[in-house]
Amino acid sequence: MIVPAEAPRAKLDRIEALGAELVPVTHEEWWQAMVDRGRQGVEGFFVHPVADEPVMAGNGTIGLELAEDAPEFDTVVIPWGGGGLTTGIASALKALRPDVRVVTAEPETGAPLAAAFEAGEPGEIRFEPSWVDGAGGRALLPGMWEHARELVDEAVAVPLAEVEEAVRLLAARAHVVAEGAGALAVAAALRREDRCVCIVSGGNIDLPVYAGIVSPAAAA
């Protein structure tokens, strides 16, 4: 499995525990592998983590569950990493509940979708890696802008301080351990006044990073 070398150790350890052989590369090389749908010297069948249709269809079951089990909401807020999660959820949900607004959340250190909506077209932006490693980037992956224009109503860039506050809120009130990308949706929803469903998409965060965020000193 091709992975960014700077990914949280907690995430990499769990992948290895499932028997995978890791091929760590720089963030730039990892991104290029997704653009090229493979990497020279790495053999095997390439499953795209974002733009693979069965993966997106699997994500769509979340949208089906929301429509069936949580009917009283106005907006779904989804973290935007590469776009596969949003595309899947929004495709299913819009088919059943076209009135629901789809809002994506990205870290302001790298929010290519928010920038694309503002500019009216996708382009490369300045990207600063951060502890919110599961979202954010310098550009949209090929094909994702077309999906986003059709399915997304609003794209929000969230300051890291607000993401940290969302991590603390999830820990204190919901007893949920969320990584940065997972807490993005909650951080974006806290700005809103409508009824929101937040997709807290992951809890793979290294313990020292998490402890530094939820400690009383960090919250002061």
Annotate each language-model stretch with its function:
Residues M1-A220:
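PLP-dependent amino-acid enzyme catalytic core
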